[in-house]
Amino acid sequence: MSLFRGIRTASILLTVGTLIFAATDALAASAPMSVSQLMLYQGADRETILVQGAKKEGQVVFYNSHTWFKAVAQEFEKKYPFIKVAEWRAEGADVMKRAVEESQAGRFLADVVESTAGNIGGIHSNGLLQEHRSPELRFFDDDVTKKGKSGVYYWADRETYISLGFNTSHIPAAEAPKRLNDLLDPKWKGKMSLAGGGTAARWVGAVVEMAGREFIEKLSVQNINVHNLSGAALANLVVTGEVPMSPTIFDSNIFVAKRKGAPVEWRPLDPVVANVGYSGILAKAPHPHAALLFIDYLHSKEGQQFIVKGGLSSPRDDVESLVNQKFKKTYFEAKYSVEEYEKKLSEWEELIQKVLVRRR
């Protein structure tokens, strides 16, 4: 009898222990997660948790620097009608400035920020971005993510490419340059222009890193006009024919103009500079559940397809962009820190002034 009694006692103790562990697990599962835990959570119930939390939050505040995000925000609201997207848009430098100044003032208003490399990098270097994970990350190459210990701080959501744009009324496609060395042909003397500021500097930097400073020296005899204009503004001059061609034109500007019937073409001449927009979640985001849902949607196949409709290219592996991307891309932000990149930009801008402007 004592043997059976012992077995029964052990069985009861085992059952009680199992119940205690089960109860402990249930309490752990139901316990609220910290924001940092939520940002890295990848459980099967992640979507449910985010939706429940977002319904209570009711909105996501999105600071960005590109007009096309309005369409993405509208589609997001259709999918999640209980979340209102409050959008603030400005130049990239102003997005960074506002995010930093609000943080310094203890005003935490924004959830998600989006801008190009230097600006998003500046926000990150101030310690303002939250490391996070997303099921969509598997569709993005490491070159377009800023990795942390367990997730990413920011990752690409759009790309445009800087290379040759030309007016076909002045330069037939069959005659236009097809390789970088073709720009040295004497027949292009006086017909080429560069944009101002960082757009031209990045192109010159890519050329220097691939072909050496000597190529820029050779290019100087072509009497290149350097305009104090953005890439988009210079593209408008290509559209009108005032500028026959330029190797510092964004593909997106040409594709949008071409849709409207303009006689223009864009051609990738290696190396092609990738101009990348990145997005991240602020560490003090007031609506963390909605922020994660938004960043998921922005990088989802559906969200990226809306980006492409706006004339941009997608860094996502399974989304087809407007331009055949079988060309060498230069990602400066993957090669240099923010500080190194700023130093390089200054060097390249000085090279433009010294070799292409002052020698004319």
Question: What is each stretch, according to the model?
Answer:
Residues S163-H170, N275-A290, F306-I307:
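A bilobed periplasmic-binding-protein/Venus flytrap-type ligand-binding module shared by bacterial periplasmic
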Residues A10-D25:
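Bacterial N-terminal signal peptides
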Residues F139-D142, T160-Y161, W188-A195, T199, K218-V221, N225-N228, L298-E320, ...:
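Periplasmic-binding protein-like
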Residues A44-K55, S65-K84:
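Short, polar/charged alpha-helical segment
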Residues S321-R360:
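Extracellular/periplasmic bilobal clamshell ligand-binding domains
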Residues Y63-Q74, V85-S103, F108-E242:
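Extracytoplasmic ligand-binding site segments that recognize negatively charged/polar headgroups
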Residues N119-G122, P244-P263:
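A ligand-binding cleft/hinge motif common to bilobed small-molecule-binding domains
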